[in-house]
Curated annotation (Swiss-Prot):
InterPro entries tied to this protein: CmoB, Mo5U34_MeTrfas-like, SAM-dependent_MTases_sf
Coiled-coil blocks: none
Free-text function comment from the UniProt entry: Catalyzes carboxymethyl transfer from carboxy-S-adenosyl-L-methionine (Cx-SAM) to 5-hydroxyuridine (ho5U) to form 5-carboxymethoxyuridine (cmo5U) at position 34 in tRNAs.
Residues annotated to bind carboxy-S-adenosyl-L-methionine: K91, W105, K110, G130, I181, E182, M196, Y200, R315
Protein name as catalogued: tRNA U34 carboxymethyltransferase
Subunit structure and binding partners: Homotetramer.
Gene giving rise to this polypeptide: cmoB
UniProt source species: Yersinia pseudotuberculosis serotype IB (strain PB1/+)
UniProt KW Transferase keyword: yes
Length: 323
């Protein structure tokens, strides 16, 4: 079973220590009552991975680990078999001892769009909400973050993160917890909070913005990346049953509307840092994620529209500060 004791000890003497009033009980209850039916299978794959310590680790330009001398072909094959037991891999890519995990999303492209616009992460304590497999947590560590904490209730993502951590030498600078943001107390302890690819899944987007704000220190920075539509500050798309085949998409504002929402929630220095159309090169079917992807979610005759007739995915990055 995944143990969280190292994380508890890590935060016990710092600004996150009040979290320990409820966190151990929450995670104990999760382990008793909420495990996914496939969790034991996933965790078994993690346990059967070798504990490797890379001789070369690059978290700055990617997530890459190498060993000298290199691992044997047999070791690499065994490692690949265990990692394939954790499919589908959605966020990455990862390059591990000669094995390339080509994930559905080129999350490195998103990072390249985000990084130039944010405050330097060196020495910061960071929260990544909806962190997935934790790819961006490792990139945050690569930028010098003191501690990167990810939360995501999807248990496969937790196992994927622990698998990567094991192959990176058990690195304790990044951690993933199987929680949603609504389960966090108002910690007001993170220097930077990221919410990337989450807002449109929330039934109450303004509540989500307040939840993010409540995790930030005074003068802390919010990095918000989400789907948007074209339009002025009054433009918001409320999809019907599905958007790009996703059922749980509730509100897609324009970037100016989202800026107004952030200001309404009390954020200051709000700016629209980047906007980019999602392409079928950035999100696609791969050998590590073999089901449908963006190409199947767009109108086959007009890629400017989804199969439902809505505007195709356009993503924006907004930066804001908690006063």
């Amino acid at each position: 079973m995944i143990e969280f004791g190292d994380f508890y000890r890590l935060i016990a003497k710092g600004p996150l220590s009040p979290w320990l009033d409820i966190l151990p009980a929450q995670l104990s209850a999760w382990q008793r009552e909420s495990l996914h039916g496939k969790f034991k299978t996933w965790f078994n794959a993690v346990e059967h991975l070798p504990q490797l310590t890379p001789t070369t680790l690059d978290l700055h330009s990617g997530v890459r680990a190498e060993m000298s001398p290199p691992i044997s072909a047999g070791q690499r094959e065994g490692m690949e078999n265990m990692l394939r037991a954790l499919m589908p891999w959605r966020k990455g890519p990862f390059s591990l001892y000669g094995l390339e995990i080509d994930t559905e999303w080129r999350s490195d492209w998103k990072w390249q769009r985000v990084l130039p616009h944010i405050s330097p992460l060196a020495g910061r304590t960071i929260l990544d909400v909806g962190c997935g497999s934790g790819y961006h947590l490792w990139r945050m560590i690569g930028e010098g973050a003191h501690l990167a904490v990810g939360i995501d209730p999807m248990q496969l993502f937790l196992c994927q993160f622990e698998a990567i951590r094991k192959l990176l030498g058990g690195d304790q600078r990044a951690h993933v917890l199987p929680l949603g943001i609504e389960q966090l107390p108002e910690l007001a302890a993170f220097d930077t909070v990221f919410s990337m690819g989450v807002l449109y899944h929330r039934r109450s987007p303004l509540d989500h913005l307040y939840q993010l704000k409540n995790q930030l220190v005074t003068d802390g920075e919010l990095v918000l990346e989400t789907l948007v539509v074209e339009g002025d500050s009054q433009q918001v798309l409320v999809p019907g049953d599905r958007y790009a085949q996703m059922r749980n998409v509730y509100f897609i504002p324009s970037a100016p509307a989202l800026k107004a929402w952030l200001e309404k929630c009390g954020f200051v220095d709000v700016r629209i840092a980047d906007m980019a159309v999602t392409t079928t090169e950035e999100q696609r079917r791969t050998d590590w994620m073999t089901s449908e992807s963006l190409a199947e979610f767009l109108d086959p005759h007009d890629h400017s529209k989804t199969v439902e007739g809505y505007p195709a995915p356009l993503r924006a990055v907004l930066i804001a500060r908690k006063p």
